[in-house]
Amino acid sequence: MHPRFQTAFAQLADNLQSALEPILADKYFPALLTGEQVSSLKSATGLDEDALAFALLPLAAACARTPLSNFNVGAIARGVSGTWYFGANMEFIGATMQQTVHAEQSAISHAWLSGEKALAAITVNYTPCGHCRQFMNELNSGLDLRIHLPGREAHALRDYLPDAFGPKDLEIKTLLMDEQDHGYALTGDALSQAAIAAANRSHMPYSKSPSGVALECKDGRIFSGSYAENAAFNPTLPPLQGALILLNLKGYDYPDIQRAVLAEKADAPLIQWDATSATLKALGCHNIDRVLLA
């Protein structure tokens, strides 16, 4: 079991501990539960889906990286496939506040970058901030997404974001988590190709500036993040954050990164290079390359 889970795990009910122990035994537990695993946990504990998601939130929050706030938020995004995806907030010393990742963004990106097609619900241990409510409104589940909070009845996103402004106001038809492929040829080594593939999946209807980041760890594992724009612009999630979300949730740490590649267009209206390289250097990675989409 990864050390970060030990405290939260010890506080779970005995029957949930017993059912989870073989799942969490792997140090690199992928921070997700398949539909089959969810069903098994429900049978072992007698909990329904909502109660089980609440019970698991401390494990999601244990994935948080909060050196600034020490305020750990956990989220569980429930995919329509039946898979549940953990998420947690992340803060980066030496970078800027704007590079911060919120727990809801983490769980949603985890699902999206894992190939999930849509979300049915999201469970969070604290009420979503306005930034996250706006981020969620970019999803193809839209205002119907169910939000579950401890001690409250579940409500749709529309109840938390009345009179919402979103992609439909800008006549955007392709939404976040819809399948997208921008068709750039995969060239270069494996890490470059992973970055280009991530750029091909970008959701960037507003700037038309595709980008993707791929991180290679010392053991050869590669984590890729795609750019995810938002109708309100500021809640946009950069591609580096997508890759860092996966790296963190899968049990790796920043010193494990040995090389990074950013893929983007040289003449794009928005350029990720400066922010990406600055944040990576703050995390200790100086081996950073840029490949140009053509």
Swiss-Prot record:
Keywords, sorted A to Z: Hydrolase, Metal-binding, Zinc
Documented EC number(s): 3.5.4.5
Gene Ontology biological-process entries: cytidine deamination
Record's GO cellular component terms: cytosol
PROSITE patterns tied to this protein: CYT_DCMP_DEAMINASES_1, CYT_DCMP_DEAMINASES_2
UniProt cross-references to InterPro entries, sorted A to Z: APOBEC/CMP_deaminase_Zn-bd, CMP_dCMP_dom, Cyd/dCyd_deaminase_Zn-bd, Cyt/Deoxycyt_deaminase, Cyt_deam_dimer, Cytidine_deaminase-like, Cytidine_deaminase_bacteria
Residues annotated as domain CMP/dCMP-type deaminase: 48-168, 186-294
Domain of life where this protein originates: Bacteria
Chain residues that bind Zn(2+): H102, C129, C132
Any GO molecular function: identical protein binding
Protein role: This enzyme scavenges exogenous and endogenous cytidine and 2'-deoxycytidine for UMP synthesis.
PANTHER family: CYTIDINE DEAMINASE
Subunit structure: Homodimer.
Name of the molecule in the record: Cytidine deaminase
Source species taxonomy: Bacteria, Pseudomonadati, Pseudomonadota, Gammaproteobacteria, Enterobacterales
Gene for this chain: cdd
